[in-house]
Amino acid sequence: METKKLITATDTQYSGILLNALNDQRIQGLYCDVTVIVEDRKFRAHRNILSACSTYFHQLFSVAGQVVELNFVKADIFAEILNYIYSSKIVRVRCDMLEELIKSGKLLGVPFIAELGIPLSQVKSISGAGGKDGGTDAPSNPDHKAPEPQKSSDSPLPCTVKIKADVKTEMPVITESFSLSSDDYKDKKASGSQDHNSEKEDDDDDVIFCSEIVSSKQAPAERKEAAQTQIPPDNEQVPEVKKVTPSSQVQLTQNSLPTNQQSSKNTSSTTQKFTPPVNANISKNPTPAANGFLSPTAQKQGTPNAVQNQHSQNITSGNALPQQKPVVNFSSIKPQQISAIKPKTEVIIHGNGLSPPSSSVIPLGQQPVTPKHISFDGVQKKQVVTFTQGSPSKPGEFKIKIADVVSGSSLDSFKDSEPRRIIDGKKIITLDTASEIEGLSTGCKVYANIGEDTYDIVIPIKEDPEEGEAKLDLDGLPNRKRMKLKHDDHYELIVDGRVYYICIVCKRSYVCLTSLRRHFNVHSWEKKYPCRYCERVFPLAEYRTKHEIHHTGERRYQCLTCGSSFINYQVMASHIRSVHSLDPSGDSKLYRLNPCKTLQIRQYAYVNNSTNGTVINDGAINVPVITDGGINVPVINDGGIVYDIDPDEPQQPASEGNHANSATKPVNWDNIFIQQSNQNMFKLNTSEGGTEFEFVIPESY
C-alpha cells in the first residue's frame, strides 16, 4: 500500500500580521462593537479582543452593553493599556506614569502590565549589585519555564534575556525574539521580555494570580543549582532533555497514566526517598490551558531529584542526573500536607503520583494553603495566594505565575470560607465588604463591579428569557438574595422581598423599571426623544420638555399670589422673592405647575394697518400688528423686506415658502401662524387685558 506524506506548515508571521490588522481596524473605527468611556474620552474597540486580553472585560462583557464607562482608570493610562492590547508593546511611557499603569493593569486584569513592576525591580537589583556577586539579588526561577533546546553562544536567534553572572557590569539585553541558552537560563526571570513572551503563549481569558514567597536563604542555593545546568557531552541523558520542544516541553502529559491508581502504582517503585520539606516542580506547558509553577526547596538538602516518567522514556534513575536541572520533580509528600490547585479538567494529584489528562497539577508545598474563597467552574477571581514558608527580604524575591486554575482543597474549607454559589444560569461572586453597597441592606453584597476597590463581579448568564427567579444549586446555603437578568441594561436584584433594578454601568438602583430604561439612554446614547420644533434629539424626555419650552414660550409656572405665569421655576422664584417678599422653597405652596399644552407654533406673517400700508421691519423680530383701521397681511422675503398686499387687489405671489391670506377672510390664529421652523417666538399676554404681544428670545439649551 502506498504511503502518503503528511505536510504541516506554520506561518510564523501570522500572529503579528493579524494583530497589526486588528489595530488598524481599531484606529479606523472598523467593526468596533464596544465603546469604553474614560474621563469624557471615548475609546472604540473590539469586544472579543478586550475580553481575550483582560479578565475584567471578559467578565464585564458577559452582562454589559455596547457602552462601558470606567471611573477608576485615567484616560491616558487606559490609552497605553489599549495600545498594548492591540500591539503587544508598551512604547515610550513616562516613568511617573509607570506606577499608575501597573495599578490599572492589575485592576483590569492584564497580566503582563500587572507584573511589569517585578522584572523592573529585579533589573535595578542586578545593576545595583553588579559590584558584589554578579546578580545575587535576582532570584532564579528555573522552574518557571522549561528550557528550550540548548543553544550555543553563537546561536543565530537573538537572546531575549542575556545576563551573565560572571560579568558584573553587563546589563540585560531585551529583544523581540525569544531564545534561551543554558548560561542565560538561570537569570531569565530578571527580564520583563520573558514575561511578555510567556504572556503571548499562555494568554488566557480566565486567570488567577498565585504567588509563592521564597525566603532569602533559598535564593543563593537556587542560583547555584541553576548554574549547574550545563551537562558534559558524554552524559547519556542529555538527548532526553533536548527532546523538550515548544510543542511538547514535558513528556509528562503524553506518558503519564490516566488514572490515579495506575499512577500511584507505577511511581511507588521508582520514587526515591527525599528529605522534607520539598515542593513539586512542573515545567510550564505553552498551551493556554492551566499552568502552574513552584520553586523546589529540597535541592539544598543534597539529595538529587529524578525525573519521574511512567512510560518508555526512562528518565527515572535517581543517580543518572546528579547535576542536571530536572524538568519535572516529584516528592513523596503525605497527601494531608498538600493543598492542591486543580484546573478545570479535574486533574487530581496525590503525594506519590500524578495523572493529568490535559494539563498539569501543582502541589503547593508542605503547609496547606486555605484560600479565602472557594471558586467553582465558571467563576473567576483575582486572588493572591501567599505561602508562609518565609518572608522575602528583598522586593525581587517572589514569583508570580499566571494560571487558569480553580482553587480549593476540601469541602470543609469551603464551609469555613465565605460561601460562593452557582445559580442556574448565573455566576455570582459576593463582595468582600458590605460597605461598598450603598442604599441596600448589608446582606446584599452583589453588585458594583466598576470601582477601584472592587475585585468581584456578579455574572448573570442569560440562558432562558422566560425563566423566573433563579434557584440555588448548593444546599445548606442561606438564600439572602436572588437575582435574574432579562435584559442587557440592568440587574434585577431581589432583597428582602423588594425588587431593585440596577444599572449595569453606573450601578444606580431604581424601583421602577421604566425609570431605569429612561436613565440608561444616557449611557447608550439612544436619543429617542426628538424635539418637535427643531432637529435636536435628547436621551431623556425631561430634557426635551425643558428645551421645547423655549420654542413654545409656554408659561407653566403660575404664582398663586398674583396669578402671573412664568416660563421656568427660576424666574418664578425670583418674582416671588422680589415682588411678594416670600420664600418659594418654604412650607407654604406659593406656585402651581400647570400641565403642558404643547402649543404648535407656526411661522407667522404680518398684520398691519391698511391706511398706513407699510410696516418697517429690521429683519430680526417679526411683529404682527392688529389695528382698528383694518387688517392686512403682508409677507416677508428672506432679506427681511415686507411687501404690502392691498386687500382690493388679487394676491401677488410671495417668496417661496410664504403664503398671504386674503383680507376678506376672518382673522384667526391659524391665519397668523404659518408652518415653518422658526426660532423667533412670542406669547400673547392676556393678563393685562390688552392685545399686547410679549416676545421671548429663545435660549440655548
Curated annotation (Swiss-Prot):
Question: Looking at the keywords, is Plastid present?
Answer: no
SMART domains referenced in this protein's UniProt entry, alphabetically: BTB, ZnF_C2H2
SUPFAM superfamilies named in the record: beta-beta-alpha zinc fingers (SSF57667), POZ domain (SSF54695)
Region feature Required for methylation dependent DNA-binding, mapped onto this chain: 470-609
Q: Which organism is it from?
A: Xenopus laevis
Q: Does the keyword ATP-binding apply?
A: no
Q: What is this protein called?
A: Transcriptional regulator Kaiso
Keyword annotations for this protein? Developmental protein, DNA-binding, Metal-binding, Nucleus, Repeat, Repressor, Transcription, Transcription regulation, Wnt signaling pathway, Zinc, Zinc-finger
Q: What is the annotated localization of this protein?
A: Nucleus
Start and end residues, zinc fingers (C2H2-type): 501-523, 529-551, 557-580
Region described as Required for sequence specific DNA-binding: spans on this chain? 519-701
Q: Where is the BTB domain?
A: 32-94
**Mostly located where?**
nucleus
UniProt xrefs under Gene3D superfamilies = Classic Zinc Finger (3.30.160.60), Potassium Channel Kv1.1, Chain A (3.30.710.10)
- Supply one GO BP term: cell migration involved in gastrulation
- What the protein does? Transcriptional regulator with bimodal DNA-binding specificity. Binds to methylated CpG dinucleotides in the consensus sequence 5'-CGCG-3' and also binds to the non-methylated consensus sequence 5'-CTGCNA-3'. May recruit the N-CoR repressor complex to promote histone deacetylation and the formation of repressive chromatin structures in target gene promoters. Contributes to the repression of target genes of the Wnt signaling pathway and to the methylation-dependent repression of zygotic transcription prior to the mid-blastula transition (MBT). Also required for gastrulation movements.
MF terms from GO for this chain are: beta-catenin binding; DNA-binding transcription factor activity, RNA polymerase II-specific; methyl-CpG binding; RNA polymerase II cis-regulatory region sequence-specific DNA binding; sequence-specific DNA binding; transcription cis-regulatory region binding; zinc ion binding
Low complexity bias locations: 259-273
The gene name reads zbtb33
